[in-house]
Amino acid sequence: MIKSALPILKRILPARLTNLYRQTIAGDNPPLGEFYPIQVGKSKNFSGREFGELLSNHNGRPMVKMAHFIGIYEDLLSPYKEAHSRSSNPLRLLEIGVSKGGSLEIWKKYFGETALIYGIDIDERCREISIPGVEIRIGSQVDQAFLSSVLKELGDPQIIIDDGSHHADHLSLTLEMLWPHLQDGGVYIIEDTHTSYWKEYGGGYLKN
């Protein structure tokens, strides 16, 4: 999927960033803070902060993220980790898009044993993923009945992360359905919004 996206990136990104993207595909490791995908556990340059150190030492399930996400996640999620450590109530996190299960594994390590971590995916193969303390449910992110059943188990989450289909229509529909269930003071994160510019994901430049 990374290689197939390269022609599109060439059209929409400055040459400098495209070169970084190409280098990463070839296996190089450019400086952190640029726009390029990294496989957590193989890139060992996340240092200086707790979340970065956790990623640097991760040797579990595969997880691919854009490098510039790491600092953003640290800034957004560290207050919830701190509040959770002082509360008797469990932190509740819902992630849309399981893939290989790497990010769910990371969230569990980061927030601790008492955190309630749920992941949803349409891929039946995700049923085979087993992560202690993490629940995975199979269904569509735009199926209201399915989402309601997951929320009935999990409760209203403090953190929602949409890393699912990345399709423009799905992003907006999922937001409409889940936003009313986000706890006051919670955070709703949508990853990879650059797909809003890609026609194959229902987007397009200056599309209304």
Annotate the PLM regions.
Residues 1-161, 165-190, 194-208:
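A short alpha-helical cap/connector motif
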